[in-house]
Amino acid sequence: MGDDSQRTDLAVSDRWQHWKRNFWLGVINGILFKVGITFSHPSTVLAVFLTKLTGSELYAGILTAVAGLGWFLPPMFVAGWVESLPRKLPLYANMALGRALGWLWMIFVVVFVAPKFPVYAAILFLLGYAVYTITGGISSLAFMDIYARTVPFRRRGAFWGLRMFWGSVLGIGGGVIVRQVLKGDWGFDFPYNYALLLSFAFVTYALAWLTFFLIHEPPVEWTPPPKSWREQLQTMVELWKQRADFRQLIKVRLLMDIGLIASPFYSTYAVVKLGAKPSLLGAFIIAETVGSLLANILWSILADRRSNLFVLKCSIACAAVPSGWVLLLTLLHYSFGFNVLPLYPLTYFFLAFAGTGIAIAFTNYVLELADEAHRPTYLALSNATESGMMLLPVLGGILLHYVSHSVLFSIAFTGVVLAVWESRKLKPAFVYEPSHSEALKVT
């Protein structure tokens, strides 16, 4: 790794002269997004909405798959083109428009279609969500490239930590609102109560997009020529062959992703099997928000003072707790007759505590491995290798017709334990910025 003097020189160069302004605009952007997710979390609010709308948990699994595939797969096809763009902010703006249209379509479906045609509404809702996630996946390449060129290395842990910390603080209030709306305190019955939550989410997302538009994007030092899809695929193959450290990271992530088979069903399990009322989702969201809040204090400090790799290993170990906790609650409920619902929100505390650390550390670790010229390709390749795993929630929804929820939770637990074992092989990244000629060697 380069020494601190090198990073100091970088931080005061012309390229980084606006980094403080960009840093805080990026933080505000993240806070607003975090609040928006509180109103419309796919694994809680939207999963229960589709289950209640259709009477089937399968649609909740499809929703999670759409979220993952839309976010992870499209970047693989456009990464080469994105690399060649001298400025990435216009792409982010165009994709924000697509995300806005997709979200407004979802609200329209809930208000005008869901009351009379629930199954058709679920399908149309998923189509709108697909538009939102696909455009979001493409915009993520622009976002991460701008982020890597605007936030100095030693401030990246604080950047993500502040985004998630203050987003979580405000998200606690959002969780209270979700609980009140779903209880009927605001005077809206199903499905209009969910349309109200989606509207709240849209307002915060729109403010987040507008905030990011104000960022001063520094010029790139060099951009490669546009690549055809075949050339881009060849670049990905070469990167994959040359970087054993990157392959090991992806192996760990894929094992961890086995936990996705159960992710949308923690909330539906509580409602369908344990008898929880939908208003308990507010407690889930509050617990998740508190978990994220506390995790940010810990993980962001450790990311800057120790390393992103250290945080990644610790948070992967913590990721085994949620599925193990639900299995324990299931045992207490069915074998001993305990009322476990008061303890069930802790599931979301544990999910957020682990997930926050992974969110802070994983992408930062990928950026540490990547050179500037091929940063979008590393991100796209990382996303593409995960895309197939995004179908696991659909498989989980199908399996629930034949096996119990406990089987899904056991599969999730096993996958994360294997990821913990494999994460021992991850090594600190060597951070450097190659010359143009060095960058071209990969292609």
Report the location of each language-model feature.
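Helix-loop boundary and gating motifs at the non-cytosolic
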Residues: G2-L73, V82, Y92, A96-R99, ...
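Juxtamembrane intracellular "pre-TM" segments in multi-pass secondary transporters
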Residues: D3-K20, E217-K251, A439-T443
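Loop-to-transmembrane helix entry/capping segments in MFS-fold secondary transporters
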Residues: E57-L58, F153-L162, P278-S279, E372-S382
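Helix-to-loop junctions at the C-terminal end of transmembrane segments
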Residues: P74-R87, L182, A295-N308, L400-H401
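Cytoplasmic membrane-interface "Motif A"-like loop-to-helix N-cap segments
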Residues: E83-L101, L162, R305-A319
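Intracellular juxtamembrane helix-capping segments at the cytosolic ends
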Residues: G136-V151, T356-A370
